Swiss-Prot record:
UniProt KW keywords: Disulfide bond, Glycoprotein, Hormone, Phosphoprotein, Secreted, Signal
GO biological process per UniProt: cellular response to hypoxia; decidualization; embryo implantation; endoplasmic reticulum unfolded protein response; intracellular calcium ion homeostasis; negative regulation of gene expression; negative regulation of multicellular organism growth; regulation of hormone biosynthetic process
InterPro entries, A to Z: Stanniocalcin
Protein name stated in the entry: Stanniocalcin-2
UniProt similarity note: Belongs to the stanniocalcin family.
Length: 302
């Protein structure tokens, strides 16, 4: 139940958070014709939008965040690349030497990949989003994001804002990678996001946190069922041992037992005859059969 509510709530939050920016984009940049309108309905960049991005990428410089700014206004609503770049540059002075080197190399790697890959993929929005997510991951891992985060955890935490996680997918990709950079980084980011969530949404975040912990808690077997399982195993083991040590009686012995029972009802010495018959069964087969016939004859005569 908590899982369903959590999923519904997060979906609603994302829809409400992105509704106003999307509406503002449509109002300020309306489609210029039927072709653009149909392109947006199919979930792909319009031809005009594609040409504008390509022209922007060619003219953008190699230094700064110009390449990422080319993707801020697009019909696929892929935003956040420029914001991440600006956040890294504004906080670069707080990083140590390793962190500054990471910022420089990672931003350059992302800009180079965007410039070369954009013209080689389709105009469909899912393909473009996948391309952006993949190149971000490649550049962050290539230049060791985790090493920079572990040495500059406090600065990394200050850069992450709760509202950005609701509005921009590139921020979500970045945080998901940071959560794999060790327990110290993970706990610091989780605590920061939780506090910001409570500041924005109040006690609702505590409910979501409780649901998440309940979902992640592994199920435990009911204690009352364990003795039943043990008793079943012991019973099966007992029957198995009994079956192993006690062989099943043969048909001949079964027949003699039945005859002995009939004899016990008619004569008090039937048990003695049963013992004699049992001793005779251990001898040769001819002697055993002869004694059986004599026993039957005496029973009939009586």
């Amino acid at each position: 139940m908590c899982a369903e509510r959590l999923g519904q709530f997060m979906t609603l939050a994302l829809v409400l958070a992105t509704f106003d920016p999307a509406r503002g984009t449509d109002a300020t940049n309306p489609p210029e014709g039927p072709q653009d309108r149909s392109s947006q309905q199919k979930g792909r960049l319009s031809l005009q939008n594609t040409a504008e991005i390509q022209h922007c990428l060619v003219n953008a410089g190699d230094v700064g965040c110009g390449v990422f700014e080319c993707f801020e206004n697009n019909s696929c609503e892929i935003r956040g690349l420029h914001g991440i770049c600006m956040t890294f540059l504004h906080n670069a002075g707080k990083f140590d030497a390793q962190g500054k080197s990471f910022i420089k190399d990672a931003l350059k790697c992302k800009a180079h990949a965007l410039r070369h890959r954009f013209g080689c993929i389709s105009r469909k929005c899912p393909a473009i989003r996948e391309m952006v997510s993949q190149l971000q991951r490649e550049c962050y891992l290539k230049h060791d994001l985790c090493a920079a985060a572990q040495e500059n955890t406090r600065v990394i935490v200050e850069m992450i804002h709760f509202k950005d996680l609701l509005l921009h997918e590139p921020y979500v990709d970045l945080v998901n990678l940071l959560l794999t950079c060790g327990e110290e980084v993970k706990e610091a980011i989780t605590h920061s996001v939780q506090v910001q969530c409570e500041q924005n949404w109040g006690s609702l975040c505590s409910i979501l946190s409780f649901c998440t912990s309940a979902i992640q808690k592994p199920p435990t077997a009911p204690p009352e069922r364990q003795p039943q399982v043990d008793r079943t195993k012991l019973s099966r083991a007992h029957h198995g041992e009994a079956g192993h040590h006690l062989p099943e009686p043969s048909s001949r012995e079964t027949g003699r037992g039945a005859k002995g029972e009939r004899g016990s009802k008619s004569h008090p010495n039937a048990h003695a005859r049963g013992r004699v018959g049992g001793l005779g069964a251990q001898g040769p087969s001819g002697s055993s059969e002869w004694e059986d016939e004599q026993s039957e004859y005496s029973d009939i005569r009586r």
